[in-house]
Amino acid sequence: MTKSELVEKLAARFPQLLLRDADISVKTILDAMSDALADGHRIEIRGFGSFGLNRRPPRVGRNPKSGERVLVPEKRVPHFKAGKELRERVDRNLTPSSGGSGNGHLTGTPSGKGPQGAAPGSPAVLHEGGGLNLARS
């Protein structure tokens, strides 16, 4: 699901909300979440999950062109952990007929191709029946 699809879904669910206002609402929420993470805070949405930061320590890497050793500095990377209710809902809806491979992975194959051959990095697609196809690498 893309941000614009989320905006459209929000506007459809609340007819009194103009599309412009739904867009502003989604942007405001995402900005607030991004700001909180950038400031080092954890975000918890009960029943959905939590967003936090993982620390990647500094390491020695290699420049792929020259083979030269390069010091890669420490990084903080966002991390999402699904809540119990979300995990149970996803597990309950993951059946072979809904596009899942039945092995617990949404990508379907080790090559990273999705159930319908979607390329890695493709956005999640939420279907009217509630099914979610997600291609990820």
UniProtKB/Swiss-Prot annotation:
This is Integration host factor subunit beta. InterPro entries: Hist_DNA-bd, IHF-like_DNA-bd_dom_sf, IHF_beta. Residues 75-137 are annotated as: Disordered. GO terms for cellular component: chromosome; cytosol. The lineage of its organism: Bacteria, Pseudomonadati, Pseudomonadota, Betaproteobacteria, Burkholderiales. Pfam families: Bac_DNA_binding. Residues 75-92 have a biased composition (Basic and acidic residues). The gene is ihfB. One of its GO terms (molecular function) is structural constituent of chromatin. Belongs to the bacterial histone-like protein family. Keywords: DNA recombination, DNA-binding, Transcription, Transcription regulation, Translation regulation. This protein is one of the two subunits of integration host factor, a specific DNA-binding protein that functions in genetic recombination as well as in transcriptional and translational control. Transmembrane segments: none annotated. It comes from Cupriavidus pinatubonensis (strain JMP 134 / LMG 1197). Residues 128-137 have a biased composition (Gly residues). Heterodimer of an alpha and a beta chain. GO terms for biological process: DNA recombination; regulation of DNA-templated transcription; regulation of translation.
